[in-house]
Amino acid sequence: MGEEFFSSLLAEQKIVLSSTQHEQFKRYFELLVEWNEKMNLTAITEKKDVYLKHFYDSITPSFYYPFTDQKIVDIGAGAGFPSLPLKILYPDLQISIIDSLNKRIGFLTHLANELELTGVSFYHDRAELAGKSKHHREIYDVAIARAVARMSVLSELCLPFVKVGGDFIALKGAGSNEEVAEGKKAIAVLGGELSASHSFQLPIEHSERQIVQIKKAKATPNKYPRKPGVPNKQPIA
């Protein structure tokens, strides 16, 4: 699984990469591996695995959601997943990444410069604090996250950023139906409602994946998100 197979998988979805996009993904991989030696960005470093489990996996929401030029916030993107592979694919997207670790922000800033990405901003902050700020609260068309947190927790971290009528998109693994069922109350309390859920298997390794789409139906109550750490310790239930 290298660049060629990555291209063939995307071609199955009617996505054809330009030479510039090919180069951007190639450089992304090189920088990820290089910086990973001095800071913990990912446990996945084999080329075939990075292309499949990071790049391809990050792009899968576009198989179900029409990305164009939306204003998107990525919560806890780590090494830039899923928003930066989506940005490479859809250059008109306006991306904001919020991450609590300043070292990662340093990597992402360098990465964006090297890949010559415009319309990207990085913020060193906790989602619980940024979600209260007038600079971020309910101004985004889409909040996106590829995180291990349960849906009840993730919804509290992400839905406050989304404007009414916008969407929260979560990239999840196996067992997501249970998570969504458990998180139904939290999603509703925060102003969201489940609008779509797409299950599929990641090629080659056939691991379960799910794209969960929550529509922001009404404004999030002012008390949310709660203080840093509280959503995780005391999920809305």
UniProtKB/Swiss-Prot annotation:
SUPFAM superfamilies named in the record: S-adenosyl-L-methionine-dependent methyltransferases
Function: Specifically methylates the N7 position of guanine in position 535 of 16S rRNA.
Signal sequence extent: none
Domain of life: Bacteria
Subcellular location: Cytoplasm
Any one GO MF annotation of this record: rRNA (guanine-N7-)-methyltransferase activity
Pfam families documented for this protein: GidB (PF02527)
Similarity comment: Belongs to the methyltransferase superfamily. RNA methyltransferase RsmG family.
Any one Gene Ontology cellular component term annotated for this protein: cytosol
Entry keywords, A to Z: Cytoplasm, Methyltransferase, rRNA processing, S-adenosyl-L-methionine, Transferase
Name of the featured protein: Ribosomal RNA small subunit methyltransferase G
Enzyme Commission code(s) on record: 2.1.1.-
